[in-house]
Amino acid sequence: IRPDEAHHPVTRLIALENTHNRCGGVSLTANYTRAVSNLAKECGLLLHMDGARIFNAAAAQGVPARVLAEPADSVTFCLSKGLCAPVGSVLCGSKAFIRQAHRTRKQLGGGMRQAGILAAAGIVALETMVDRLVDDHARAKRLAKGLQGISGLELDPGTPYTNMIFTGISEQIPQDTREIVTRLAELGVRVGVTGKRRLRLVLHYWIDDAGVEKTIQAFKEVLVG
């Protein structure tokens, strides 16, 4: 929160991400979010939650998503990540807030025509995909256990918290990161690059038990030979 100083922009909003991507998919508790919400109110600020994967956070903690969202003034969540819809996100807030957001969207030209078919997919996601997120988390644990046994991989302590695995690549591995990613892709495994020698793997509906084993074997082939 910036001080009241003419050279700085005025702080109006605190934004939290749940789950937190760059921290390895860790989920924020309702108590933590409520403490931040209280701080925001004391300072006359609003609290927004980027809840792209809030249902993963809820699944990890065994609580309804609304419990994690309640302390925030506004929340967004993604339909196309863990919930596996083809596209879409949802903005949540008070009626007055949504009314203003709708007007702002119109002003910016962000409306879509005949988007009902996308909404239908989102409804299916909310009705059928939430309860199975724990399966992704379980597979992430199995994948992490398999990767931990491969020389040259340096998994973050505590990972995975939810459905994401972050791992470093030891300097003892001669290949550079892009070469490793390319070889994995040739073996049918796609991973993200989040740093010079750092990878991210995300578990989702389309990764089954066979996919977990395939990923472990692909890493062994690329890094160990």
State the predicted function of each range.
Residues 1-157, 161-187, 192-207, 215-223:
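Conserved PLP-enzyme active-site core in the AAT-like
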